[in-house]
């Protein structure tokens, strides 16, 4: 009987079982290890490739940003961070010759709304603040809300311009989101009506519209500057980028004397009122320099408040309105006749009645014969007509032109007229030659007549006029004989003595009054212009003055009655205010030599008359 060793068998069986149950010795796990190894390697490679591709993309993008599209992207960045702030240039001031302000810019504020921001921030919901804002702007709350809602797509809407700083500061304290305050300026005119026609005015944006404000606008405006900075998201400045220099506006110093200007305006305004006239104008000129010291027109207007002002009130009639100068040109006829040698200084002229082209030459105070002095003292139309007919028309036209008639004054003021002279005409009728000698058939502005008398006052030296201060004085150009011009000035003193109303106490004055009928629609009408033009003091002339009263309707209309007293008041004030030495006492001791009386009938010499 065979016996098996059961214990050995069972031991072998156990050993086999241990080997089978140990995971590290299981044969079927070997392929699994190979798969895991391949997967990990592939994933590593994929990750590496993706990272490399990402790096390449970043490098490419950086290259694109830095080189290909750098400007565009830089601009986009600048839009988000750069801010350009304006550095405002304040409009220059207008000063009188002594530095007194005639026009100045006053700081104000503009109230601006950003409707987009206001609606986005729901600013309109704050009824209390909106109501307070509306009240300060002079609007109802409902109107303000409607205005903002109507412009809901706008980012910039003016609510008010030129608001006083006290109001602006109150509005700023309301802290309404979308309400912006901007600095601006408003023009202020201290002399109001008195210098309105000379200085002019600007619009709400500071652009010159009339007068000096317009003529000298390029000097007065200057140029705004700017400052460019970079800001962070909180609005803090992190870098100063650049500055654009501002060019300050220049002040303009006028030849006008503010004290004289004010006085002249008051006198003209008073004369217009007392004579129930359409208007009045006066121009005062410094004979030595050609500077316009005063130029006033009445009625005037308030440039600080032009609401409802008629455009005709804004005209500077001293330069825009032309008139037939009447007898104010007669001294130049006598001057021309003496210069041309067609009359002797002591000659007696036939001034009896005569007709030309069927029309009688009329004198207000007719006399049979008169000296040159008497022709001007009595303002004889017949006398100057006789003289004019002795000369070619070109002779008188040349004198008028040398005195400045028909020529612009070149003050630079807008709207200036040059008048009518017709100096280049080839054919003249005798009646035209005669009427031109007493100021009909030609036209001039008051400023041109003032320039002509300034030429007489400088004893024949023509100087250009200036509305700005002149330093040093202009030498000028001699256009008339000094001796003959002094004779004419001496005759004008006799005219003043006879008239009396134009005289100034303590001073020797020379004047010529004139009265001319007005033309409407091409026909003479029963309306008149009353002139008085003259110079003072006679011993050493300093000022030339022209006063014009347009269409006086209170009764008298002659220059000697209407404008002569105004001349006296203005000239007297100017002489005393500037401490011009009196010269009337010297005149009392002078003797006037009696002229030889030689009578001429027409062109023929008659016998001497004592």
UniProtKB/Swiss-Prot annotation:
Residues 9-18 have a biased composition (Basic residues). It is found in: Cell inner membrane. One of its GO terms (cellular component) is plasma membrane. It is an enzyme of class 3 (hydrolase). GO terms for biological process: cell wall organization; division septum assembly; FtsZ-dependent cytokinesis; peptidoglycan biosynthetic process; proteolysis; regulation of cell shape. It catalyses: Preferential cleavage: (Ac)2-L-Lys-D-Ala-|-D-Ala. Also transpeptidation of peptidyl-alanyl moieties that are N-acyl substituents of D-alanine. The active site is at residue 327. SUPFAM superfamilies: beta-lactamase/transpeptidase-like, Penicillin binding protein dimerisation domain. The chain crosses the membrane at residues 43-65. One of its GO terms (molecular function) is serine-type D-Ala-D-Ala carboxypeptidase activity. The keyword Chloroplast does not apply. Pfam families: PBP_dimer, Transpeptidase. It is a single-pass membrane protein. Belongs to the transpeptidase family. FtsI subfamily. PANTHER family: PEPTIDOGLYCAN D,D-TRANSPEPTIDASE (PTHR30627), PEPTIDOGLYCAN D,D-TRANSPEPTIDASE FTSI (PTHR30627:SF1). This is Peptidoglycan D,D-transpeptidase FtsI. It comes from Haemophilus influenzae (strain ATCC 51907 / DSM 11121 / KW20 / Rd). The lineage of its organism: Bacteria, Pseudomonadati, Pseudomonadota, Gammaproteobacteria, Pasteurellales.
């Amino acid at each position: 009987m065979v016996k098996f060793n059961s214990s050995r068998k069972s031991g072998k069986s156990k050993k086999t079982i241990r080997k089978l149950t140990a995971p590290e010795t299981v044969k079927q796990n070997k392929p699994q290890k190979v798969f895991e190894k391949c997967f990990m390697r592939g994933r590593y490679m994929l990750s590496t490739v993706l990272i490399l591709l990402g790096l390449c993309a970043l490098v490419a993008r950086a290259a694109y940003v830095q080189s290909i599209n750098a400007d565009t992207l830089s601009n986009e960045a600048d839009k988000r961070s750069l801010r350009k702030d304006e550095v405002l240039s304040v409009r220059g001031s207008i000063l009188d010759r002594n530095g007194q302000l005639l026009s100045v810019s006053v700081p104000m504020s503009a109230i601006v709304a950003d409707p987009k921001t206001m609606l986005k921030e729901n600013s309109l919901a704050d009824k209390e603040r909106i109501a307070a804002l509306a009240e300060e702007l002079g609007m109802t709350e409902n109107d303000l809300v409607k205005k903002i809602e109507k412009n809901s797509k706008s980012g910039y809407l003016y609510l008010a311009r030129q608001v006083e700083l006290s109001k602006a500061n109150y509005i700023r304290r309301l802290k309404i989101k979308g309400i912006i305050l901007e600095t601006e300026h408003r023009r202020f005119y201290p002399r109001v009506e008195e210098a309105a026609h000379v200085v002019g005015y600007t619009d709400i944006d500071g652009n010159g519209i009339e007068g000096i404000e317009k003529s000298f606008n390029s000097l007065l405006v200057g140029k705004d500057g700017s400052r460019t900075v970079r800001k962070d998201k909180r609005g803090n400045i992190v870098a100063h980028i650049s500055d654009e220099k501002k060019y300050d506006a220049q002040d303009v110093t006028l030849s006008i004397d503010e004290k004289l200007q004010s006085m002249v305006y008051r006198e003209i305004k008073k004369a217009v009122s007392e004579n129930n006239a359409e208007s009045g104008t006066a121009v005062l000129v410094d004979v030595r320099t050609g500077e316009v010291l005063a130029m006033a027109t009445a009625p005037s207007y308030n440039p600080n408040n032009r609401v409802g002002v008629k455009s005709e009130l804004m005209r500077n009639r001293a330069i825009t309105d032309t008139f037939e100068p009447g007898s104010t040109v007669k001294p130049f006829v006598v001057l021309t006749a003496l210069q041309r040698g067609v009359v002797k200084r002591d000659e007696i002229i036939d001034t009896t009645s005569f007709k030309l082209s069927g029309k009688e030459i009329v004198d207000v105070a007719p006399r049979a014969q008169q000296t040159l002095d008497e022709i001007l003292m009595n303002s004889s139309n017949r006398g100057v007509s006789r003289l004019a007919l002795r000369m070619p028309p070109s002779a008188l036209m040349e004198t008028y032109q040398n005195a400045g008639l028909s020529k612009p004054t070149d003050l630079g003021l807008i709207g200036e007229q040059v008048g009518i002279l017709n100096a280049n005409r080839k054919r003249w009728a005798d009646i035209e030659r005669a009427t031109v000698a007493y100021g009909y058939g030609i036209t001039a502005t008051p400023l041109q007549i003032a320039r002509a008398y300034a030429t007489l006052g400088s004893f024949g030296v023509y100087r250009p006029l200036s509305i700005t201060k002149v330093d040093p004085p202009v030498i000028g150009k001699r256009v008339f004989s000094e001796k003959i011009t002094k004779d004419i000035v001496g005759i004008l003193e006799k005219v003043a003595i006879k008239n009396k109303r134009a005289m100034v106490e303590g001073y020797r004055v020379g004047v010529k009054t004139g009265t001319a009928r007005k033309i409407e629609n091409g026909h003479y009408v029963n309306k008149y212009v009353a002139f008085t033009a003259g110079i003072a003091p006679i011993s050493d002339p300093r000022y030339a003055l022209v006063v014009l009263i347009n269409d006086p309707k209170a009764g008298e209309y002659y220059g000697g009655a209407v404008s002569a007293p105004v001349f006296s008041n203005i000239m007297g004030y100017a002489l005393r205010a500037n401490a011009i030495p009196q010269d009337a006492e010297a005149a009392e001791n002078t003797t006037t030599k009696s002229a030889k009386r030689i009578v001429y009938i027409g062109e023929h010499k008659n016998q001497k008359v004592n």
